[in-house]
Amino acid sequence: MTTWARSLIRISTYEVETLQKRLAEIGSRRASAEMRLAVLDAEVEIERERARADAEAGMLLQAYLNGWKHRKSTVEADLGELEAEEEGARDALTGAFEELKKFEHVAELSRL
């Protein structure tokens, strides 16, 4: 195998590894956002139960719900952005992996 082929394969492998790490990081951020959304949903149920049990808490429930809706829409927007970012990262990883396989194939053919 020639030096240039080894260099191309090494660079392509590094790019694939970097993109895999990026995809894992995006997945972690997405899981965190999904957890925040689940926590928000659980919190609103707790507040609704508290409002049913306590008249004073019931009067404050509407203000809480307004804030909750805002926080929920923010998290949902973050999730939408993360989904788009994840799709882009997957596409980039697919392309980088295809390039790596092309270089490996050319190197194998040049060895024969």
Language-model segments: which ranges?
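Charge-rich amphipathic alpha-helical interaction elements
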Residues: 1-112
